Amino acid sequence: MFQVIRRFATSVSNVADIVIIGGGPAGLTLGTALKNSPVTKHLKIHLVEGGKIIEPLNSFLETPPPNYLNRVVSLTPSTIGFLDSIGAWSHFNQERTQSYDDIVTYDGVSGARMNFEHPDIATMVETTNIQAGLLSRLNELNSQQEVKLVIQEDTKVTSIAKDSITQWPTLKLSNGDSLTCRLLVGCDGYNSPVRHFAGIESRGWSYNRWGVVATFKFADTEFRFPTGWQRFLPTGPLALLPLPNGYTSMVWSTTPELAEMLLSLDETEFLSMVNAGTRLSTEELSMIYDLAKSKSPDLLEQIQWRLNLFAGKLKPADEENFPLQVSEIVTGSRARFPLKLSHADTYVEDRVALVGDAAHTTHPLAGQGLNMGQEDVKSLVGALERATSRGLDIGNSLALEPYFSERWPQNHVLLGVMDKIHKIYSTDFAPLVAARSFGVDVLNSLGPIKDFMVGRISGNSKR
Amino acid sequence: MLIVQQFQKRSFIIPSLISSGLSYLSKDIRLADKMEDGELHFPKTEFEKSQNTSRPLFQRPEPNYPGHVPLYNFEKLLMFLGSSIGAFVNPTNNNFIVSLGESTAFPWVLNRLRTQMLNDPSGRQILKERPHMTSKSLNLDELKNYPDNSLGKSYFLWLEREGVSPDTRVPVKYITDPELAFVFQRYRECHDFYHTITGLPIVREGEIALKLFEFMNLGIPMTGLGALFAPIPIKSSQRRRLLSVYYPWAVKNGTICKPLINVYWEKIMKKDIDVLRSELGIEKPPDMRELRKKARSKKKQVA
């Protein structure tokens, strides 16, 4: 008898309307957006995160670290508009964000280039800044409301099962608690436990490439407007994206063995290597890669020789066709991550929804990954608002289906486009290089088509 | 008759109409030109008028390196046509060979050679130092004191036997990229070392055999054209000897031997030439002068 009562008591005290797994940008945005909406703010929401986030994120805002962190993403105007509409954007540390108007991409083999211009075409923000801003907004919302969003940090989900009576998802947490909910939302990344629980298949492939990231400072040789640079090398694109005060965030997608080589260099060698990567021909680069792999002691000297030759040949008028050289690296900012394409067969099951990386991962070449997740959140919140105002059970497939049917096709198109761009550029086969360069030259001179593309990547023409 | 008359009439009327129309418009055209140049509101002073600031009708782009003559593609094409016919008709004229070589040294060919050099330590050193071979830089006078059978001594003896000098090499003029121009210059200057190491003489037959060897090894188009067309106008006995002895040798050795463009000849002058040959993977072909002598004496005996 006692046992029955106790079990009853536990299950009552730990029932939530929505449980969000994962305190990354997607999870925090979803929590904030739901609490911000007048329709859904009364819902009882738990956010479960495996790591510690509250203390580090608060201290990020109170005493920002002196250096830029290496996990930086580019936000589209559409994403920023959404963050602003839920009241979070003003909580960001604005001094650490950098918006820019101009993106230049150039072909590493033929040099064919493309310019995308649009006011505030993208904004670079550290992911920690995003999380901290959202958490700050969430605290503000919590202080104004009776039903508060509960963040359970440093808590791992040990198992997910269906409740035997209600068929609702029931979580066992590492602190011994159990949690039952009407709707379980997985914002828990690529290896999403929620997706596994729901039995949703995710399909795709590894690109067999790694993204090497690091934070640099540009050499202070001349004034430049902040510009996003991307050079398509046959091994993968090398992007230098602007941060405030002449700093820049690099993502160099490359083969696993080259990524390993890049991480094994010392910092001055790595700097030279990045400068070589933005300028030198693929033949010169392959020589330099070989020297670096064999740990040649005169690597720096050889790179400098080729860079000097390059600078000697460059006409003053063409100098602005290349990014400035980087001259300083933020110590310890080097890291790498694997690149893969994956797309879940569906985003929703009965009482389960997937958001962000749990549903899809993509190549970072157009900086769309996080923005797609933000669009997911926007759409899911809309679906939940409609369901709530119509008196539907928010865990019901009927309530969730609109989210899936709106987002899946759009994400699928974007994933496909990124995949094709990656494939077109990952060869140096001469006829293909000629064809893609011709295509780029034509596109670059067709204003309206380019404007359409800019609209797509900056998320303006979606609605 | 009538038509002719009418035509004549019209041929008088139409041009006069056009010219009167133009003279009517020309005032406007001149005015527009003046406005564009800003002379309408800010007329030129006497001093400015005295300065001749107009650009010449045709101007070549700036040279990329000393001695460079930038050519347009159609000029390169004309040069190729002229020099290829000239070289076929009169192969002993060095001007034709030189221009044929430069007009067919396409960037992708030289780029491939440069890539080969970049990926080899000594090739890289050559690219970095950009050495030029002259009789002075090679210290010809010292070479004769080198040990017998050393590369330096053999080179010296070969120069003496053939009566040539390393100073007769023409500088590259028409290749756009300075580094690629150096690569081609380097090929040109090393040509005599290829003679030395293979022992082929500078008679027409020897040059043809060496051209095929070079083409197989370096892939320079001019050498391939030479190997293809040069044997056509020569004596049939010579052609037979080329095809039966020297072409098979050139194909085999040119393909298997290491890229000769990467050899820093100046630095290995003291090396034994036989050792060098085996390092590079070249077999010495039969002595061409000997074979020719034998053939000639045989012919005499028959006669």
UniProtKB/Swiss-Prot annotation, chain B:
Amino-acid positions noted as binding Zn(2+) in the UniProt annotation, renumbered to this chain: 191-192, 195, 207
GO cellular component, one term: extrinsic component of mitochondrial inner membrane
EC identifiers of the protein: 4.1.1.130
BP GO annotations: ubiquinone biosynthetic process
Co-factor requirement: Zn(2+)
Keywords in alphabetical order: Lyase, Membrane, Metal-binding, Mitochondrion, Mitochondrion inner membrane, Ubiquinone biosynthesis, Zinc
InterPro entries to which the protein is assigned, alphabetical: Coq4 (IPR007715), Coq4_euk (IPR027540)
Superkingdom of source: Eukaryota
Pathway listed: Cofactor biosynthesis; ubiquinone biosynthesis
Catalysis performed (reactions): a 4-hydroxy-3-methoxy-5-(all-trans-polyprenyl)benzoate + H(+) = a 2-methoxy-6-(all-trans-polyprenyl)phenol + CO2
Membrane topology according to the record: Peripheral membrane protein
Transmembrane stretches, start-end: none
Localization: Mitochondrion inner membrane
Subunit composition and interactions: Component of a multi-subunit COQ enzyme complex, composed of at least COQ3, COQ4, COQ5, COQ6, COQ7 and COQ9.
Purpose of the protein: Lyase that catalyzes the C1-decarboxylation of 4-hydroxy-3-methoxy-5-(all-trans-polyprenyl)benzoic acid into 2-methoxy-6-(all-trans-polyprenyl)phenol during ubiquinone biosynthesis.
Family to which this protein belongs: Belongs to the COQ4 family.
Cross-referenced PANTHER family: UBIQUINONE BIOSYNTHESIS PROTEIN, UBIQUINONE BIOSYNTHESIS PROTEIN COQ4 HOMOLOG, MITOCHONDRIAL
Miscellaneous note of the record: This protein may be expected to contain an N-terminal transit peptide but none has been predicted.
Protein's recorded name: Ubiquinone biosynthesis protein COQ4, mitochondrial
Annotated source species: Komagataella phaffii (strain GS115 / ATCC 20864)
